[in-house]
Curated annotation (Swiss-Prot):
Keyword RNA-binding: no
InterPro entries reported for this sequence: Dermaseptin_dom
Family recorded in the similarity comment: Belongs to the frog skin active peptide (FSAP) family. Cruzioseptin subfamily.
UniProt cross-references to Pfam families, sorted A to Z: DD_K
Lineage, uppermost ranks: Eukaryota, Metazoa, Chordata, Craniata, Vertebrata
Cellular component GO terms, alphabetical: extracellular region
Tissue: Expressed by the skin glands.
GO terms classed as biological process: defense response
Protein name, per record: Cruzioseptin-5
Main subcellular location: secreted
Localization: Secreted
């Protein structure tokens, strides 16, 4: 059985990675995504 905190950590890491990717996309291609 997985620990609840392990799940939270895993989800938090995935969300953080996705957020970083989104920010990088916005910075790299400023107004090409309308």
């Amino acid at each position: 059985k997985r620990g609840f905190l392990d799940v939270i950590k895993h989800v938090g890491k995935a969300v953080g990675k996705a957020a970083l990717n989104a920010v990088n996309d916005m910075v790299n291609k400023p107004e090409q995504q309308s």
